[in-house]
């Protein structure tokens, strides 16, 4: 039923409908969006879409994208190669998104509207997916934006009240998707390249995110049994077939992902050691550097794969590195199998732990 007497709608499933005269072929429609208020949405509309000149708007957008993508000039290769490169480069700007609106922003991390004090607030950064390449690229082509993104992480940590670095910040808050705490890698990389970071605050947030929050994938719960086991033994234990789960922090579908979490956390702790070193925290830097070698605890020299162990320290056998652990190999890895996770450790380190007689 369409209620023609109303000119507004509210609610999660709110919608609007329009009727047009017969023969109408073109409709001009503008709309404003705001996470703050209706008044702010109207201001955003008039600032961003002053009129219905679609051609002028498209040309302005084209110029912005040409300037943005023109930061990298490609020589050589074919036109197809350039198309692939610039299409991929374009997608690195998909996220994170800037939430600031005229100097204010809504944060789902505490449900409040804040002043940004001149520093844009970014979110919707799927860090598990972006820390390896997108963030390092940004440190080379847009250092100011990378600094603002990391500053946004620290605001999130403060706003959540626990000072835990976010792991998967979205518009709706930190959804804690995937595994590990790879925001620490963005901080370590930024410091290594001379970017401006509140190092002390970043270290606190990264350390607490790793130590106080559970390492169980897809969870924002406090550290529990699995975390204590990892600290004492240097790896996340795997369950044997039909062995019941005993840690309530473990997601029933996402499972423990023990190899993925062990390898990912080892890298996170190496990054944390670099930040501690930058702060001249020598003992903590040495401690986390030692922890960073935990990936070796799951390296099976006989097979040259990273292999899950049970809580007694025994390899899970028999084992198929191609199709292990159910949907997405989550019972042992995380959305990849043993062959892919073989390369999760930097290659020079793999060479060091491989048998010298085995070809690399």
What are these regions (language model features)?
Residues 352-360:
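Single conserved hydrophobic/aromatic residue that forms the stacking wall/gate
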Residues 123-276, 289, 341-349:
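Aromatic-rich carbohydrate-recognition surfaces in CAZymes
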Residues 154, 285, 290-323, 358:
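Non-catalytic carbohydrate-binding regions of carbohydrate-active enzymes
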Residues 1-121, 155, 200-215:
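Acidic/polar, glycine-enriched structural segments that form the non-catalytic walls/loops
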Residues 94-100, 158-164, 214-217, 296-306:
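Secretory-pathway/luminal and periplasmic proteins that interact with or process carbohydrate-rich
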Residues 295, 331, 335, 339, ...:
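Extracellular protease catalytic domains of secreted zymogens
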Residues 70-74, 88-94, 139-142, 154-158, ...:
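Sec-exported extracytoplasmic/periplasmic mature domains
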Residues 72-76, 101-123, 167-174, 219-261, ...:
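Active-site-adjacent structural elements in folded domains
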